[in-house]
């Protein structure tokens, strides 16, 4: 009886030891390469005429766009979800921007504004258990940055 109990204990012990690992969730933060510089207020500044912004993830081969939000200064925030196309890379189209992921490349196209107030946009991305976000501030026609 003692031999059976010892044998059972030795068979079960590896399951307890292997399930107590710290490796789950230890994802490196996403690292990006781009020619666009983020300002000290943590925004990518966009002129009223809009523009295209390209970001290259250097440490993950792919990721997907999770959500996008947009807001006018002192206005209500609107949230948008991605359009999935047969499990291909996701894209999001809002009233003011389009964000698309292709492999390790994120392309954000911001439309021109016709509003006097500044517009604020955020694009959120995910690769497994690691998340990142891109904040854009588009200057209004009658407001400086």
Residue ranges and their predicted role:
Residues 1-4, 18, 123:
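Positively charged n-region of N-terminal signal peptides that target proteins for export
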Residues 5-14:
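Sec-dependent N-terminal signal peptides
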Residues 13-41:
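Bacterial Sec-dependent N-terminal signal peptides
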Residues 33-35, 40-55, 97:
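Short beta-strand segments of immunoglobulin-like
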Residues 52-107:
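Surface-exposed binding patches on compact interaction domains or structured appendages
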Residues 106, 129-145:
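C-terminal edge beta-strand
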Residues 115-129:
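A short beta-strand micro-motif common to beta-rich folds, especially ectodomain repeats
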């Amino acid at each position: 009886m003692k031999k059976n109990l010892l044998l059972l204990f030795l068979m079960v012990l590896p399951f307890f030891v292997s399930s107590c690992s710290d490796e789950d969730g230890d994802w490196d933060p996403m690292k990006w390469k781009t020619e666009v510089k983020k300002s000290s207020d943590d925004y990518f500044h966009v002129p009223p005429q809009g523009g295209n912004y390209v970001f290259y993830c250097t440490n993950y081969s792919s990721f997907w766009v999770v959500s996008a939000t947009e807001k006018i200064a002192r206005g209500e925030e609107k949230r948008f979800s991605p359009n999935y196309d047969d499990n291909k890379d996701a894209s999001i189209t809002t009233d003011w921007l389009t964000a698309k992921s292709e492999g390790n490349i994120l392309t954000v196209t911001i439309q021109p504004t016709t509003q006097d107030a500044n517009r604020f946009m955020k694009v959120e991305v995910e690769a497994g258990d690691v998340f990142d976000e891109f904040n854009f501030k588009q200057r209004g026609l009658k407001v400086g940055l």
